[in-house]
Amino acid sequence: MRPRGAAFAAGPPGDLHLGTAIGFAGAIWRSRSPAMSTLLDIKSSVLRQVQVCPSFRRRTEQDPGSASADPQEPATGAWKPGDGVEFFAHMRLMLKKGEGRQGLPCLEVPLRSGSPAPPEPVDPSLGLRALAPEEVEMLYEEALYTVLYRAGTMGPDQVDDEEALLSYLQQVFGTSLEEHTEAIERVRKAKAPTYALKVSVMRAKNLLAKDPNGFSDPYCMLGILPASDATREPRAQKEQRFGFRKGSKRGGPLPAKCIQVTEVKSSTLNPVWKEHFLFEIEDVSTDQLHLDIWDHDDDVSLVEACRKLNEVIGLKGMGRYFKQIVKSARANGTAGPTEDHTDDFLGCLNIPVREVPVAGVDRWFKLEPRSSASRVQGHCHLVLKLITTQRDTAMSQRGRSGFLSHLLLLSHLLRLEHSAEEPNSSSWRGELSTPAATILCLHGAQSNLSPLQLAVLHWQVSSRHHQTCTLDYSYLLGLLEDMQAHWEEAPSLPQEQEESLADSLSAFSEFGLQLLRQLRDYFPATNSTAVHRLELLLKCLGKLQLFQPSFEICPFESELNMDIAAALKRGNREWYDRILNDKSPREQPGPQRLPGLVVLADAVYDDLQFCYSVYASLFHSILNVDVFTLTFRQLERLVAEEAWVLTEELSPKMTLEVASGLFELYLTLADLQRFWDSIPGRDSRSLALAGIHAPFLPAVKLWFQVLRDQAKWRLQGAVDMDTLEPVDASSRHSSSAATAGLCLSHIQELWVRLAWPDPAQAQGLGTQLGQDVCEATLFYTELLRKKVDTQPGAAGEAVSEALCVVLNNVELVRKAAGQALKGLAWPEGATGPEGVLPRPLLSCTQALDDDLQREAHTVTAHLTSKMVGDIRKYVQHISLSPDSIQNDEAVAPLMKYLDEKLALLNASLVKGNLSRVLEALWELLLQAILQALGANRDVSADFYSRFHFTLEALVSFFHAEGQGLPLESLRDGSYKRLKEELRLHKCSTRECIEQFYLDKLKQRTLEQNRFGRLSVRCHYEAAEQRLAVEVLHAADLLPLDANGLSDPFVIVELGPPHLFPLVRSQRTQVKTRTLHPVYDELFYFSVPAEACRRRAACVLFTVMDHDWLSTNDFAGEAALGLGGVTGVARPQVGGGARAGQPVTLHLCRPRAQVRSALRRLEGRTSKEAQEFVKKLKELEKCMEADP
C-alpha cells in the first residue's frame, strides 16, 4: 500500500466535556380531588361528587427539611452520624444518575447544541507546493491564452465578455495594469492554436424504413465543409441542403475536407454506433459539420468507395472524385445513372462549428431533409467538443500537459476564491465565481480533458486544499460521486495521472483516520453540526472504499476498515488515559483514587451511550464498522482492570467513606453490564466485568446497615418538624409523610437499580432491606401517634383536623411501603417464581399492611364517633315526623347535616380514607335506623314508607352518581336486613305469614344431615280434589331420650292457614326406640288445586319425640312446596294412590330469619296474627337449643 500523506501536524482542540443528560428523580405523592359540592337542592338530597384522587409522586424539588439546594457533584466525604438529610441527598444523586440508564438509549440525543463544530486541524504544508515566480508567470500566460483564443458558444451561466475575463485574471494574479497589458500583447503575438472538432456519433432513433422488411440498414457519412464551399451560392443553399451524394443538375461538385463513414447497422430503425471521429478545423467561424444518414444496399459499394476516397484526401478535386465514386457505385444498381435515388436517403445535419458550446454538447439533433422532395424522420444523438491540438504557450513548449496546467490553474483559483469568500469558514462548498468557472471550462475544453480527468483534478485539488483550509464535506462527497460516475463510463487514465490520484486518495484517507482517532474532540455527540460533519466524512471514506479506481491503485477494500478500527482503538485509549490521569492518577492511594474512579466509570458509561445512540448507526450503515462493540469491549476491559485492582486494595480498609464510594462505583459497573445485556444477542458473562459484584458485597452490606439507621433518623427529624398541617393547598398530607414516602421510594428504586446478580445473596439482601422498610414504616406511624397525642386541645375541633392529616399520612405511607416492598421481588434465576417475595418478607409485608389498616380504622372510628349522637338525633327526627309532612322534608335535616360534614371531610381526606369514613358512617346510619324501627311498634304504614324513602335517599347520597361508594357495597350486609325489615313491616298479616312459610322453604336446603332425613311422596288427585301425602320413613334422627334413641312421630299440616282454613293437621303413629323409623302412612287433604298453586303453599312436616311423662320434644322440621307436586304443576300420569317419586327432605330447626318473622307478627294486634303467634310459641316450647 502506498504511504498515506504527510504527518498530522495540527494538535487537537482543548478537551471537550461530554456531558451526561441526567433526569430528575423523586417526587412526593400528592392528593388532588374535586371539592365535594354543597347541598344545592335539599329535596333531592343527593351528593353529586365525593371522589378524591390521591397520587404519590416524587417531588423534583427537595423534600421538607432538607438543604436549600441539592449539591451538583456527588459527595465524596462520609456523612455525619444521624444526619439523614445529607445521606438521602447523596442517594438522590445516585438515583438521578441511574434514571438515564434504563434500557437502551434512544438512537438520537434529545439535547444537542446547534453551535458550530470544533475546528478541524489544518496544515499548510499538506497543500500543493508554492509556485516559483516564473511558474506563476507561465500560468498567467496560459490563462490569458485560453481567454484570448477561446472558441465556441458561451453558455448562459458563463461570462462572454472578454474584457471581464481578462480583468478577473489581472485581479487574481495580482499584476499591475502595465504588466497586464504587456502580457496580453505577448499572447496576441503568439501563434493561434490549432482547433479540432471531436465528434461522437452515438445513436439514432425513429428512422424512416426503406427496405421491404420494414427496416433500414443505416450508416452515417460525416465531414467538415470548409468556408469556401459553405459560403458560396447562398441562393442554391437556400433551396436545398448539401449532401454527400452524386452530383445533380443544380450545381457542381461539393468537395469535403474529410469524409468519415460509420459501420452499417442492419435491419434497424434505432441504430447504435458509438463511434468517435476527430476533424481538423481551419476556420472556426465558418466551417460546418455535415452528416448524412443513408440506407445501405447490398448491391451498392458506396461505403467502400468512401473509404477509398479518404485514402486520397490530399488530392485536388476531392469533391469531383467523390462524385465519381458515387456515380460508379450507383451505376451497378437498378436505378439509372442520372436518378437521385432519394429513397436511400434517411436525413442529414448541418452544424456550424462556431455554435458548438465551449463545454461541448451532448444531445439529440433532429434530422433534416436535403430538399423539399426528401421525406425524413427521426433524431441523431451526437457528442461534440471543440478542442485545441497545438498551443503556442510556454507551458506547452516545456512539455507541461494540459492535465498539469489545469491542476495548477484550478488550485490557484480555488485558493484565492476561498480566501476571498470565507477564509476561516468550514462550510465553503467550492462555489467558484462565474469568471473563474468560465476560465476553467475554457481551459479544460481547449486542453482536451475528459470529464473523468476534470473530476479527478477537482477532487485532487479540493481534497488537498481541505487539509490546509477546511471545506464542507458535502462538497468533497459530491466530487467523489462525480468522479465515480465518470469512471464507470470511461475507467481509464494515463499511468502518471492514476498515480497522482492514488496519492490524493491515500492522503485524504490518512487525514480522515487522524480525525477519527480524536472522534470525541472534533465530532462531539452533543453537537449536531459536528455529527453531521462526521456523517459526511464517513461517507467520503466509504466512497473511497467503494470507489472503483481505488481497488486498482489503493488496496482499501481489505485495509481501510482495519485502519479505521485501529484509529478508533488508539483514540479510545488516549481518551481513557487522559481522564484517568486527570481524575484518578495511579500514584495516589486507593481511598483518594476512589472518587475519581467513580467519575471515570460514569464518563465511560456516558461515552458508550453516545457511541450507541449516535456513532454506531453512522459507522455501521456507512462503513460497516461496529464501532460500539469495539469501543465497549475496550473501555469495559480498562475499567474492569482498575476496579478489580482497587477493590482488592480497599477491602481490608473498609470504612463508611470507602463503602459509599464502592457502592456508587458498583452501581455504574452494573449499569455497564446491563447496558451490554440489553442489546439483543449480547451476554455479559463474556465481559471482563463478569463476577465483579463479589468483591463489592461487604461494601453493599455495610451501606444497607447505614441506610436503615439513616432512614430512622431522617423520619425522626421529619416528624419533629411536622406541624400536622397539609404542606400546601393541593395536598392533604403533612410534610413528614412526603419525606417518608420519598425515602421509601428511594429505597425501592435503589434496589431496582442494584439488581444484585447472585440469587442467593440477593435473597438475603432483599429480605433484610424489606424488613428494614417495614421497621421504618412502623417506626414512623408510632412517631405520628405520639405526635398527635401530645397536640394541645385534644378535645377540640383542631384534633379532628390533625386526625385527618394523620389518617392521610398513614394511607400515603402504607401505599409507599407497599410499592417499595413489591419492588423487592426475586431476581431472575432465584428459587421460586419470578416476582414473588421471599416467605419471611411476604409475612412481614402482610403484617405491616394489617397493622397500618388497623391503625387507619382506629383513627376512622375516632373521627366518626363524634357524629354518632347527631346521627341518632336526626334519625329520631325522621321517626317522630308526623305523617302529614312530605318524606323529603322529614329527611332534609339529616341529608343537610351529612352533606356539610362530608364536604369538610372531603376537603381534608384522600380518596381511600374518605371511602373508609363513608363506609363507617353508612354502617352507623343503618344501625341507627334499625334501632329506630325496633323502638317503634304498632305504627302506621306511612312510618315505614318514610324510612324506606330515607334509605333510598341515603343510597343515592353515598353513591353520588358513581363518585362515592359502589352500589354493591351499599346494598349488602346491614342494608339487606334493614330492607327486609321495612318490606315486611309494610306487609299485611297474611303476607307476613306467607313470608314465614317462604323462609321455611328457603332454609330446607341450607343444612344437610344434621337433624336427619325424612322421605315422603306427594301427589294431587284432581278427580277427588284432594292432596295425597305419604310419609315413608326417616333416618339419622337426633337421639332425644336418655337411652340414646327417640320415639318419633310426624305431624303433617298444610300452610299457610289462611290458604287452607278447613284443613286440620294429621300425625303418624309413634315409632318407639328408633332413630330410623319406617311409617308408610298415607294422608289425604281435601283442598282445591288453586290453593296449592299459591307461592307460599307447602306441606310442613314436624318430627316430634313422644314423651309419656312430659311435653313432647321437637326433633326437626321440613317443608315441601306444593307448586311442584305431581298433579298440581302438571297432570298426574299413571294414576294410583302411590303415584310420584319419593322426595328426601333434610330436617332442620327454625333459623333466625324464620324467627324474625315471628317477632314481626308479635307486634301485630290482629286476631289472625295473634292466633298464629300463639300456635308457634307452643311449638317453640318443645324446641331445645341447637346441638
Swiss-Prot record:
Binding-site positions, Ca(2+) 2: D1041, D1047, D1105, D1107
Tissue expression per record: Predominantly expressed in brain. Also expressed in nonneural tissues such as breast and testes epithelium.
Textual note on the cofactor: Binds 3 Ca(2+) ions per C2 domain.
A single GO cellular-component term on record: presynapse
| MF term (GO), any | SNARE binding
Report the cofactors: Ca(2+)
Supply the Pfam families for this chain: C2, MUN
Q: What is its main location?
A: cytoplasm
Q: Which stretches of sequence are listed as region Disordered?
A: 55-81
Q: Which residues bind Ca(2+) 4?
A: D1107, S1110, D1113
Gene Ontology process terms (BP)? dense core granule maturation; exocytosis; G protein-coupled receptor signaling pathway; positive regulation of insulin secretion involved in cellular response to glucose stimulus; positive regulation of neurotransmitter secretion; regulation of behavior; regulation of dense core granule exocytosis; regulation of synaptic transmission, GABAergic
Q: Please list the residue ranges annotated as the MHD1 domain.
A: 663-784
Domain C2: residue ranges: 176-335, 1010-1136
Where in this chain does the record put each MHD2 domain?
888-996
Membrane disposition:
Peripheral membrane protein
Q: Which PROSITE patterns match?
A: C2, MHD1, MHD2
Residues binding Ca(2+) 3 are L1040, D1041, D1105, D1107, D1113
Q: How does it assemble?
A: Interacts with ADGRB1; this interaction is direct. Interacts with endosomal SNARE proteins VAMP3, VAMP4, STX6 and STX16; this interaction is increased in the presence of calcium.
What the record says about family reads: Belongs to the unc-13 family.
**Function description:** Functions in endosome to Golgi retrograde transport. In response to calcium influx, may interact with SNARE fusion receptors and membrane phospholipids to mediate endosome fusion with the trans-Golgi network. By promoting the recycling of secretory vesicle transmembrane proteins, it indirectly controls dense-core secretory vesicle biogenesis, maturation and their ability to mediate the constitutive and regulated secretion of neurotransmitters and hormones.
Its recorded name reads BAI1-associated protein 3
Which lineage? Eukaryota, Metazoa, Chordata, Craniata, Vertebrata
Q: Which gene name belongs to this protein?
A: BAIAP3
